[in-house]
Amino acid sequence: MKKILLLAALFIGSVSAAWAADHPVTVSDFVFTPSTVNAVVGDTVSWTWQNGMHTTTSLSIPKGARRWNKHMDASHTRFRIRVTVPGTYSYRCNFHVAQGMTGTIVVSGASPGQVPATN
């Protein structure tokens, strides 16, 4: 019985991962492109550095979500988070917020037919 439960848990985990999408965001000049990402719980958002010195720093995030503050430059070219809590995540570049370098991630619940991950 334990083997069946373990196999079922592994299957559910792999099915959820199969639905997860990656949402790329380019970090360059004074802009995140795209500035708004629409995601589903379990998806990832991946920032890729192009030029300059920047951060991706969470501002307001849903309760229970993890904050982040990552420096991005020629030595730190990629950063990724998995969104696990539905809601709106606002973030910015600490160096260029005055120039409008901000972004938003809007996360909805599980898509139809997707099995939500459990802890």
Question: Which residue ranges define each predicted feature?
Answer:
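Positively charged n-region of N-terminal signal peptides that target proteins for export
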Residues: 1-4
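Cleavable N-terminal signal peptides
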Residues: 7-8, 18
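N-terminal signal peptide c-region/cleavage motif recognized by signal peptidases
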Residues: 13-15
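Short, low-complexity polar/charged micro-motifs in intrinsically disordered terminal tails
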Residues: 9-11, 114-115
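Extracytoplasmic copper-binding redox domains, predominantly the cupredoxin/blue-copper superfamily
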Residues: 18-119
